[in-house]
Amino acid sequence: MTQTFIPGKDAALEDSIARFQQKLSDLGFQIEEASWLNPVPNVWSVHIRDKECALCFTNGKGATKKAALASALGEYFERLSTNYFFADFWLGETIANGPFVHYPNEKWFPLTENDDVPEGLLDDRLRAFYDPENELTGSMLIDLQSGNEDRGICGLPFTRQSDNQTVYIPMNIIGNLYVSNGMSAGNTRNEARVQGLSEVFERYVKNRIIAESISLPEIPADVLARYPAVVEAIETLEAEGFPIFAYDGSLGGQYPVICVVLFNPANGTCFASFGAHPDFGVALERTVTELLQGRGLKDLDVFTPPTFDDEEVAEHTNLETHFIDSSGLISWDLFKQDADYPFVDWNFSGTTEEEFATLMAIFNKEDKEVYIADYEHLGVYACRIIVPGMSDIYPAEDLWLANNSMGSHLRETILSLPGSEWEKEDYLNLIEQLDEEGFDDFTRVRELLGLATGSDNGWYTLRIGELKAMLALAGGDLEQALVWTEWTMEFNSSVFSPERANYYRCLQTLLLLAQEEDRQPLQYLNAFVRMYGADAVEAASAAMSGEAAFYGLQPVDSDLHAFAAHQSLLKAYEKLQRAKAAFWAK
């Protein structure tokens, strides 16, 4: 068998692919290659997924088909090893009360009487970073996955690189502020760590360049010419009508970062891609392949025009958009003829061990502490790297403003609503509680509660505003029910099934009729049945009487058996739990 070695990797692509595929099979995961793209020469991307759980998927990119597949499989292990596939979901009562929730080496810190953050969590530097005003409470740090207040706060062990001490960081903080940044998997520990550190630099420098509207130096043609495969890809894109700018993003040789920007003159938009690696050529190739990962040439019309509004470009919401799908705003200043930094033909490359030391030296120079959790329980090296002040995707204030566990205390209540028989005023009190606690009416209930509902039921599209309509119906407040029904039709009907949209049209009509004291409802029954169908009229009538206000919501138990999608997710997680238990028992 041929052996293909590429820079930055400690094993041949063929060996990595065979090993990754065998390990996944041994763990019980059936992975399929769902789609391939090769829109220009030397740019490949692939989408792979679990045949049994559609929520577990990754994308890979590379200059060759093998490189893209190895990339996707590596990312799959990265997300399995760090539990990232499950980051947005509650894992149910059984796992929440099991021997361990995340890893056997996790540590639980019971909540204190005064709700202070317990001793033993975080170090002084982290406490000062996350909570400078000393306002953080312990109950804010319950993890979404367990939602188990009785057990307390789950801390995961990280090694502080300056002195190799173990520091416990709450899973809640990791999930809320860092999401997928700094996660990596590789053939060796150093390869994985170099990849993770490179990603931290990539996102940090990208945010600085965008937020500060920095003008970057172009990479000279003679330097680009050293990488003919990249040049061929760029020339093909330009021949298709997409001007390309390739920039040195190192900010004067400080960081191993490249930026490539694509213009789409057909609609006046642009898209900036960033990549990082100690090897200049690897960083350049990654940036160009990232530009087209998961995209064909027909998919390059969804970005935004450059702007002169530097304040809007620098807003955190814009930077978050860039993290999610790179479709945020870019300043025209990026393209100024006179760059803010000179071009540097940088090179930080060496063995992966040397590259790790080189990248760590940059963090040390900037006085940034690096915390690393290494994972080997799946037979593949993986890690999660946290660099407070550099790798944060969301600001620390989100622990107060947008904590992913902020709806956990309502989960049992909301899931019990279908089939409930409360006093009418209790339903109306729940509307008041939702208002008092400041929940956005547009929030999807499944996301608030951490549910994988599948798309075949009312829970999938349910937002807080629609829930208020249902609660008002159950509480007998038809005027308030009409307000929230009309809100639902205006803001949510575009995602409804035809059946659900028809139900709401019927419900609105019946609610409007209920306000007409002089009209007799029975006079209109035949017309309503002809317009909306007997089923919709019956369902809307039952909702208005309070008999069945929660249309399309099935009852849900504490382990979420009502949701097949969630059950497939839990089955995947149980495979990981078995592997963790076996590894840590050695």
Curated annotation (Swiss-Prot):
Q: Where does the YcaO domain start and stop, copy by copy? A: 60-437
Task: Tell me the first and last residues of the signal peptide.
Answer: none
InterPro entries (alphabetical): YcaO-like_dom (IPR003776), YcaO_C (IPR041080)
**Which PANTHER family does the record match to this protein?**
RIBOSOMAL PROTEIN S12 METHYLTHIOTRANSFERASE ACCESSORY FACTOR YCAO
Phenotypic effect of disruption: Mutant shows a decrease in the ratio of methylthiolated to unmodified S12 and a decrease in transcription of a subset of genes.
Q: Which GO terms describe its molecular function?
A: ATP diphosphatase activity; magnesium ion binding
Q: Which Gene3D superfamilies match?
A: 3.30.1330.230
Disulphides: none
- Name it: Ribosomal protein S12 methylthiotransferase accessory factor YcaO
Task: Give the organism the record lists.
Answer: Escherichia coli (strain K12)
Protein function = Involved in beta-methylthiolation of ribosomal protein S12.
